[in-house]
């Protein structure tokens, strides 16, 4: 069985997702900040965190990752290596937003299109989703028809392309080839805001007409 709790974190209200199976094997996706809040939820639910996953290297998706890696003693997977400069420059990027400097770190494992992540009974397939950032990836659970797609597609909107190596044309191509090929009832968990479905965005998203 698939279990999901979204924990809004950071001043950016980023959707940190905690996912677990019936045996309480868990993964945390995009721990953007507020590590104590995430740890408290995990402990309350008595979850066994096995991996930390990252869709992309923007600060609001990674500021708590290194702290959680040390706390849970687990490996970090993702994003694609094209986002490496964002991890290396994290302290400076934090300060440019007027935030306390989070230490630079690198994931233990970069991920590529076609890779798979297994957490207990759950399997996530990796797709490369460039456009918002060059190394952006998504985690797709085809059995449960749910995708954790970071800041690529939102309800009625799309990701920014004015940040490091963002590209509007590439983002639109990514959405149409890597998300809109899914079934209409496939659920999209974005990096910010409420969830949506592929079918809804095909019909109503003004950026994708």
What are these regions (language model features)?
Residues 3-5, 48, 75, 109, ...:
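Conserved beta-strand segments of alpha/beta enzyme cores
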Residues 34-117, 204-207:
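Active-site HxH/HxHxD metal-binding segment of metal-dependent hydrolases
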Residues 24, 33, 59, 83, ...:
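Short, glycine/acidic-enriched loop or turn micro-motifs at the edges of active sites
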Residues 7-8, 107-108, 128-130:
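Short Gly/Pro-enriched turn/cap motifs at secondary-structure boundaries
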Residues 93, 122-209:
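Metallo-beta-lactamase
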Residues 1-45, 138-150:
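Conserved beta-strand hairpin/beta-sheet module of binuclear metal-dependent hydrolase folds
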Residues 28-29, 50-57, 76-80, 128-131, ...:
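Active-site neighborhood of phospho(di)ester-bond hydrolases with catalytic His/Asp-centered motifs
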Residues 17, 109, 114-115, 137, ...:
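Residue-level detector of beta-strand structural context in well-folded domains
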């Amino acid at each position: 069985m698939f279990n999901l709790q979204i924990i809004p974190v950071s001043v950016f209200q980023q959707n940190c997702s905690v996912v677990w199976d019936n045996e309480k094997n868990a993964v945390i996706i995009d721990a953007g900040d507020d590590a104590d809040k995430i740890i408290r939820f995990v402990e309350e639910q008595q979850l066994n965190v096995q991996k930390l996953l990252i869709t992309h290297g923007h600060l609001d998706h990674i500021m708590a990752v290194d702290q959680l890696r040390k706390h849970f003693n687990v490996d970090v997977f993702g994003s694609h290596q094209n986002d490496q400069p964002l991890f290396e420059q994290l302290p400076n990027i934090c300060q440019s937003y007027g935030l306390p400097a989070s230490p630079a770190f690198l994931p233990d494992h970069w991920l590529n299109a076609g890779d798979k992540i297994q957490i207990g009974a759950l399997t996530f397939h990796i797709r490369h989703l460039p456009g918002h950032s060059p190394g952006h990836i998504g985690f797709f659970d085809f059995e449960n028809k749910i995708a954790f797609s970071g800041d690529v597609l939102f309800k009625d909107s799309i990701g920014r392309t004015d940040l490091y190596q963002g590209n509007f044309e590439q983002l639109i191509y990514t959405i149409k080839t890597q998300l809109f090929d899914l079934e209409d009832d496939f659920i999209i968990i974005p990096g910010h805001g409420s969830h949506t479905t592929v079918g809804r965005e095909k019909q109503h998203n003004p950026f994708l007409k």
